[in-house]
């Protein structure tokens, strides 16, 4: 009983101490909470290091932290973001626990600037959980984008597709179970499963590279199934580093960059000149994108 009493006393002392690390109350409120994504997936914040304060502290290391106001911190972060000074943003890190379909994970790991540890089907048995898209997300192949969707299928055709997906997903899991019952190794049994089965991982990344990931994967041209994860994570970033998030939206997420030729077109249009695409050397796709931006049709 004496040992137990001492342990309780030590634990109570540890709980009563105030941490000296930077704490963001808005993130403390959502630590370990699941944010549902797709039909069975989720994003869960596991840990974080730093805040907006860490960014400005790193940027001001040459002359100390000083006594700066929030407006001055915001102005500095805006400057860093506008001029692509990335190192200060690398001082913050965040770790997520994510559950996602395997085909989404394969896109995700193309971003090689994170630390990843994935659930291993060599050591553990996978659950009978697979992704089935909602009917309005079952679409034709895009005619002008080799990677993208076109128009949605009719409800009847979409239902046909999802019914087949469910049938095949159930069938391959039954095969997977038969292999396991027969004593086939897990690392061989798993290869029968399809790409819509769910996996899980821990994913840790610094703020700069996270923002790069989110800029690409939250874009309207990104595949829907990865975009919804990015949108969920953006909301977490907004709580974590609100000044950095505001600068990111202003200078990256909702801004536009132009090629030299496109900028020349913009200048001529501002000057009231008529401009034909054929006279600019700009390709059809870039021209269409430029006109969409100028017409605010995106």
Swiss-Prot record:
Binding site for FAD: 87, 110-112, 118, 206-208, 212
EC numbers, comma separated: 2.1.1.148
Binding site for dUMP: 107-110, 118-122, 190, 217
Active site: 217 (involved in ionization of n3 of dump, leading to its activation)
Coiled coil: none
GO biological process annotation, one example: methylation
Pathway: Pyrimidine metabolism; dTTP biosynthesis
Residue window of motif ThyX motif: 110-120
Reactions the enzyme catalyzes: dUMP + (6R)-5,10-methylene-5,6,7,8-tetrahydrofolate + NADPH + H(+) = dTMP + (6S)-5,6,7,8-tetrahydrofolate + NADP(+)
Gene Ontology molecular function terms on file: flavin adenine dinucleotide binding; NADPH binding; thymidylate synthase (FAD) activity; thymidylate synthase activity
Keyword NADP appears in the UniProt entry: yes
Cofactor note: Binds 4 FAD per tetramer. Each FAD binding site is formed by three monomers.
Entry keywords, A to Z: FAD, Flavoprotein, Methyltransferase, NADP, Nucleotide biosynthesis, Transferase
InterPro entries noted in UniProt: Thymidylate_synthase_ThyX, Thymidylate_synthase_ThyX_sf
UniProt xrefs under CDD domains: ThyX
Residue stretches making up the ThyX domain: 41-251
Highest rank taxon of the organism: Bacteria
NCBIfam families attached to this UniProt entry: thyX (TIGR02170)
Family: Belongs to the thymidylate synthase ThyX family.
Description of how the protein assembles with itself and partners: Homotetramer.
Protein function: Catalyzes the reductive methylation of 2'-deoxyuridine-5'-monophosphate (dUMP) to 2'-deoxythymidine-5'-monophosphate (dTMP) while utilizing 5,10-methylenetetrahydrofolate (mTHF) as the methyl donor, and NADPH and FADH(2) as the reductant.
Identification of the protein by name: Flavin-dependent thymidylate synthase
Organism: Ehrlichia ruminantium (strain Welgevonden)
Gene giving rise to this polypeptide: thyX
């Amino acid at each position: 009983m004496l040992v137990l009493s001492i342990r309780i006393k030590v634990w109570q002392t540890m709980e009563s101490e105030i941490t000296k690390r930077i704490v963001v109350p808005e993130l403390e409120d959502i630590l370990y909470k699941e944010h549902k994504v797709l039909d069975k997936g989720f994003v869960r914040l596991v840990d974080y290091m730093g805040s907006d304060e860490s960014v400005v502290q790193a940027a001001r290391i040459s002359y100390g932290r000083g006594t700066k106001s929030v407006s001055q911190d915001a102005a500095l972060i805006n400057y860093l973001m506008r001029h692509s000074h990335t190192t200060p943003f690398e001082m913050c890190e965040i770790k997520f626990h994510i559950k996602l379909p395997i085909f989404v994970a394969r896109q995700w790991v193309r971003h090689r600037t994170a630390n990843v540890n994935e659930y291993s089907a060599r050591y553990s048995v996978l659950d009978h959980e697979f992704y089935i898209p909602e009917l309005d997300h079952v679409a034709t192949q895009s005619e002008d984008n080799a990677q993208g969707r076109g128009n949605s299928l009719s409800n009847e055709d979409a239902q046909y597709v999802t019914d087949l997906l469910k049938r095949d997903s159930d069938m391959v899991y039954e095969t997977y179970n038969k292999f396991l019952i027969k004593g086939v190794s897990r690392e061989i049994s798993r290869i029968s499963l399809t790409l819509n089965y769910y996996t899980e991982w821990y994913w840790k990344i610094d703020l700069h590279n996270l923002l790069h990931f989110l800029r690409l994967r939250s874009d309207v041209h990104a595949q829907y199934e990865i975009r919804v994860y990015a949108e969920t994570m953006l909301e977490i970033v907004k709580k974590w580093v609100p000044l950095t998030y505001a600068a990111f939206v202003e200078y990256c997420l909702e801004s536009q960059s132009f090629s030299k030729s496109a900028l020349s077109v913009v200048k001529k249009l501002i000057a009231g000149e008529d401009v034909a695409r054929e006279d600019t050397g700009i390709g059809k796709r870039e021209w269409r994108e430029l006109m969409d931006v100028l017409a605010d049709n995106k």
